[in-house]
C-alpha cells in the first residue's frame, strides 16, 4: 500500500538508529493459507530477533507474504534509553539563539521571561498560560522536523529551495531550544516546574507554533512571513496576531469587482459580469497607513512591505498574498491570559452618563419585539415544547461542568464529580431537585468561570452556570432558533444554508450606487452598556408573551426564563488569583447561557437596525439586506445616486458617530466592494476564509485520546488546506505515526499501518488520499474492518456500576415515564444509552475504556482475529455494487469561473466543471414526515439512526412507537396507511446514507451533487421501481466519478448494468447498515 507505510519505515530507522534497534513488520491476509504464512513469518522474526540474528534472510524466504499480504503494523524495539532528540538537535543549533525582549507586552507575565522569574516557587507555578494542550510533545515535533530535513537534504531544483528555506527557519528554532535544553514532558504531556524553571516560560508553545509555521513554508513569500512571525512571536505573546491581521478589514474595501457570483431567486450561485469600482476615501488610506505604522513599530518589516507593494495596484490576482498573511497571523498560537485580566478587560470601560437614551430605548424595544415575534406563535398555541420545557431540558442536558465538585453516591460507589448530568441524578435521588427555583448568582453564590482562548484576541471568560439555568432556557431558546432558521437575517442559523449563500447575498446588491456597512460588535456584546438594555428587552418581551396564554405551564416556562435574566442582571463571578478566590461584581454579558448565540444575534440585529434608523434621518437609501452572523453584522444600502468618495466618508463617520452615541466600542467600516467578518471575507467579488486553525497547539484539554487528537490534527490540516494554508503532508503523516503508536513496554512500541488507520472502522484516523473518502471493498479491507468491529465497544466497570445503581435507574425511568404514554423499548433503551454515554466525560470512566481499547487494539495489531460479524457496513453495499460498473474515458469542459481562490487545484477543477452547492444536504432525517409528526406532539428528538431503525419495522410496530410518544391514534393510523410513509422510508434511507458517506464534510460539501454535468457522465438503465437502489447506484457512481477527478484531474463516465434479480437482495441489505463511529468521524463532527 501507499506512501504512509514507506515513510513509517523510514521514520523508524531514523528514530531508532542504534545497533540494538529492530523493526518487525507484521502482515495479515484474508486468505487462510497466506494468513498461516503471515503467522509463521511473525513467529520466526521474533525468534531471530531474540537471538540477535538478522531478519534479511526471512524477508526473502517469505517474499510471498511481503508481496501479497497486507501490512498490519510494525513492531519496533530498541534498548536505547534514547535522548536522541538532544543529540540530533545539536547539529542544527548553529546560529545565535533568540533573545526575548522583555518589555514588549503590557502584562508582565505575557513577556517571555525565564519561568522562575514569573513564578518564583513551584506552588505559584501554573502551566495554564503556555500549555500546548495536545497529546504530543515538543521532542516529537522536533523529531518530525529533523526527520523531514534529513530525508530531503539531497533534494534538487525547486524542492531544494523549499529544503533550504525550512532548514534556515529550523536553525533559529533549534538554536533557541538547544540553548536551554529540550523541555521534557511528563506522562500527560505537560511541562512541570522543575523542567521549565530555568527556561523561558513560553518556549514550548512558541516552538510548537514555529515548527507548524516552518513546515508550512513553500515559497519565498511564505519564508519571509514565517521568519518574521517566528522571530517576533518569541517576544510578543500578546498583540502580534492582531497587528498583522488588522489591515484586512480595510484591504477588502480596495479591490474592484470585475465579475462575481450572486445568489439568484433559486438560491443558487450564478455568475454576473458586473463591474463595481472600489470607492475609497482618503481617510480610509490614512487609517490603513496608521495600521502599517503600528506594524513597523512592533518590529515587522517584510509583511508591511508586502502589503505596501500590493497597494500600488490593489489587484485581485495578487490578493492571495494578502489572504496568506491574514491566515498565517493566527499560527503564532493562542493568546492565553490570566482569568483576572480576562474578566477585568470587560469591566474597565468607564461608564459615561453621556449616552443617547432615545437610541437605547429603541434598541431595547427592538429586542423586545423580536423576542415576541419569535415566540408568539408557540405561546398562543400553547406549544407542547413550552409546556414540557423541563423534560426537554433534561433530555438534552449536557455532561459539562456544573461549576462545583460534589460527592455523589451511586449504589455502593461514592464518586466526586462536577458533571451536570450526575448532579441532576443525585439531586433527584435526594429530593434536592428544584427546577422551579433558579439559584441566585449574586455575591452569596458567585459564578465559577471557564475560559475561551483564541489567537489574535484577548481571552474571554465563560460563565459556568448551575444546571437550572440550562433547563429554564432550553425550550424557549430552541423555539427562537426555529424562528431564526427561516429568517434570512440570521445568517448563522438560516435553514441548511452554507457560507457560500451568504456570500452571494452580499455580492447580489453591490453596484455603483450601493455601499455595504460592516461592523464587528464583539466588544459590544461583552460590554457593560449592553447588559441592562439587553436583559430588559428580553424581560419585557417575556412579559408581553406571558399575557398571550392562559396555560399555566407555558406561563411557568416564561417566568423561569425571565427569572434567569433577572438573576443575571446582578451577577458576581469568582476568579482564582493565586491562592485566593476573588469575587467581583460582573456587569456584562458573558457566554455560558443556552441563549448566548440566539440572544446575541437578536441584540446585534437590533443594534444595526437602531443605527440604520438613525442615519436614515440624514440620507435617503433603501436597505437591501441586513445580516447578523455571530459577532458581526452587515447591511447593504442602496442610494438614488452614484456613490462618491465624499458620501462613503460621510456615511462612515455618521455610522461611527451613531455607535459612539451608544458608547459602543465597535469597529464599523463602510465599503462599496467587500466585507470582512470573523467567519469569512469578500474581496474583489471572491470569497475567502481564514485558514487559521492551529495544529500543534490546542485551545484546551479535553478527554480525547491520542488517536482522537491525531484525527483532529488531520482534519484541521484538511480544513486549512481547503482555505489556502498548506502544511507539508509528510510532516502531518509523521505526526500521525507518532500519535497513533502504542507503547507496549519501555522499549517495545507498535506502529499501526496505513490500512489500519485509513479503513473506515472504529479506528479510522485519516484518508490515504486527501479530500477523498475511500470505502475499501477488497477482501483484506473488509476483513480488517470486521476484525475491528468485533472489538469496537469497550466496557467500563465504573460505568456499569453507576448505571446499575438505583440513582441512575430511577432517573432514567423517571424520564421515560414523563415522556412515554405507553411502553416503548426503543426509546427507553435509547434514553438509557444516551445517559450512559454521557458518563464518558467523567475521566475515570473514559480512562478505563481507553485502557480496554488499547489492550484490545494491541492484540489485534499483532494478530487479527477472524470474526464472523453479521453486521453490514456501507463497504459491503459498495462491494456488491462495484462489479456491475464499467468505466470509460469522458470529457467535461471547465465552464464555471473561480470564486474561492484559496482552494487547492484539484478541488477547484471539480467546482469549475460541475458547479458548487449553496445548501447542506439534509442528513439527519428532520425533513421526514415521521420526524415532523413526532416533534408536533413530543419533545423527544429521535436520531437519524433511530429513525432508520424504526421506519423499517412492521407497520403496527411503527404505530405503537408513535402512539407511545403521545401521537394521537388517528394520526398514527393515517401516517402508516398513507403514501407519505413509503416516501419516508426512501427519504430516511437517503438521509442515513448521506450521513454515512459524510457528504456535508470536507470538500464534498462544496460540490453540486445534482449537477446536470455530473449526471450526464452516469448511465444506469432503469429497471423496476426500487428508488432506494437507484439512489445508491447513482450516489456511488457520482462519488466514484468525483473521486477519480480529484485524483487524476480528468473525467470518466460510468455505465451500470445492475441485474434486476440482485436489486431486491441489495434493497434488503440496505436496511441493515451499521454506522461506524471513529476518531475520524468525530473529528469531522468537531469541525462543525
UniProtKB/Swiss-Prot annotation:
Q: Where in the cell is it found?
A: Virion
Q: List the disulfide bonds.
A: none
One GO cellular component term, please give it: virion component
Its Enzyme Commission number(s) read 2.7.7.48
Q: What residue stretches are annotated with the RdRp catalytic domain?
A: 501-687
Q: State the PROSITE patterns in the record.
A: RDRP_DSRNA_REO
Keywords on record: Magnesium, Nucleotide-binding, Nucleotidyltransferase, RNA-binding, RNA-directed RNA polymerase, Transferase, Viral RNA replication, Virion
- What does this protein do, in the record's words? RNA-directed RNA polymerase that is involved in both transcription and genome replication. Together with VP3 capping enzyme, forms an enzyme complex positioned near the channels situated at each of the five-fold vertices of the core. Following infection, the outermost layer of the virus is lost, leaving a double-layered particle (DLP) made up of the core and VP6 shell. VP1 then catalyzes the transcription of fully conservative plus-strand genomic RNAs that are extruded through the DLP's channels into the cytoplasm where they function as mRNAs for translation of viral proteins.
Record's protein name: RNA-directed RNA polymerase
